[in-house]
Regions:
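Cytochrome P450
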Residues: 1-399
Length: 399
């Protein structure tokens, strides 16, 4: 096998052969159409080293001149009104920005959101049950996370269809000149700004109101409020969509595992963790840049070199996981060695919320739709053509 192609329908459907080729070699210089390149880290041990390395920073300003000129960062990386959030920050700024949101993801709020997730899921499954068929992506995996993250943030109902439509565009791989992503970013920035302004006038009990209150005390700047709200709105639902869709597919195609998960909540939890490992809704961790010479996997990475950690490749590394390419929830029950949510200080703040929604969705599907089956052959399913997130366009079922 020659050097693999890391984009296209075949790769989207099954990236394992490409990643196996890459893991046999030191970190790879991955070229982009812009003419620039980045180090791609694919081995589990190297990924853990990179994600924990104190000399690898997140601030886009740390990228070298070639990367800065290339425009490889999302458009929002270069807008103060959208880039001033925790993903682009390093301690102590990262610590301050993360702390500003932490209360919204605490145990008490998670219990409230579990009850809301159950209500939303029941309503969505009611509709599928009444029709006798459905699409578990459009009928469940999308509307549930959007409803929950908008509830948490305090985004009114009238904006939610726009959130769905335009966030899809941001992850599109067919936007060769970036114009669609810029348009989507503009629309969603205006949406978030409108909601923030409304909360400044009348605060509620939601996260955006909390952020606005911290702005009033000087803890956060106006740009940090908007950036944080934007980050959580987009990042807080897209990966959960992928988790629910790919987990539902795994249950539909592994009836023995579905039967165990139906009876045992612990096995259902193992299904969620194995889905996160095998399908890693966030395929690649966000950019990192060395502040000094750093050696990882036998390669020396220079200050400013852009680095991507392939979470999906690392999670399928046979050096770290037995039967790494297979769905084996029982074999790995109780383990959380995968890096689907990252590790270290940048561990995803919404990890518990994503797991909660997946648990509610899977428990409800297994209980209420026990005879659900795929309505098309599995090989006909199409995967998102995204270098960022992993998920399905559709998951049609019959009852």
């Amino acid at each position: 096998m020659g050097e693999p192609v890391l984009f296209g329908p075949d790769f989207d459907r099954d990236p394992s052969p490409a990643y196996a080729w890459l893991r046999e070699r030191p970190p790879h210089r991955l070229g982009f159409p812009t003419g620039t390149w980045a180090w791609l880290i694919t081995r589990y041990a190297d990924a853990v080293t990179a994600l924990n390395h104190p000399a690898l920073v997140k601030s886009p300003s740390a990228g070298n001149e070639e990367w800065q000129r290339s425009g490889m960062g999302l458009p929002l990386d270069h807008r103060p009104s959208l880039a001033s959030h925790m993903i682009n920050a390093d301690p102590p700024e990262h610590t301050r920005l993360r702390r500003a949101c932490a209360g919204a993801f605490g145990p008490r709020r998670m219990q409230d959101l579990r009850e809301r997730a159950q209500q939303v899921t029941d309503e969505l499954v009611d509709a599928v049950e009444a029709r006798g068929h459905g699409d578990l992506v459009t009928d469940l995996a999308y509307p549930l996370p959007i409803a929950i993250i908008c509830d948490l943030l305090g985004v009114p109902e009238r904006y939610r269809e726009d959130v769905h439509e335009w966030s899809l565009v941001i992850d599109s791989a067919d936007d060769t000149d970036g114009s669609k992503v810029r348009e989507a970013t503009d629309v969603l920035e205006r949406l978030v700004t409108e909601v923030v302004e409304a909360k400044r006038a009348t605060r509620g009990t939601d996260l955006i109101s909390d952020l606005v209150a911290q702005e009033a005390t000087g803890t956060l700047s106006a740009d940090e409020v908007t950036s944080t709200a934007f980050l959580i709105l987009i990042g807080g639902h897209e990966t959960t969509v992928g988790l629910i869709a790919t987990g539902a597919l795994a249950l539909l195609t592994h009836p023995d595992e579905a039967a165990k998960a139906r009876q045992d909540p612990r096995h259902r939890a193992a299904v969620i963790e194995e889905t996160l490992r095998l399908h890693a809704p966030l395929q690649n961790a966000t950019w990192r840049f060395p502040t000094e010479d750093v050696e990882i996997g036998g390669r020396v990475m220079r200050p400013g070199d852009p680095i991507l950690v392939s979470v999906l490749a690392a999670n399928r590394d046979p050096a770290a996981f037995d039967d790494a390419g297979a769905f084996r929830p029982g074999q790995r029950a109780g383990e959380r060695r995968h890096i689907a949510f990252g590790i270290g200080p940048h561990l995803c703040i919404g990890a518990a919320l994503a797991r909660l929604q997946a648990d509610v969705a899977f428990e409800t599907l297994l209980r209420r739709l026990p005879k659900a089956r795929l309505a098309v052959p599995e090989e006909e399913l199409t995967w998102w053509p995204s270098p960022i997130t992993r998920g399905l366009f559709h998951l049609p079922i019959e009852l």
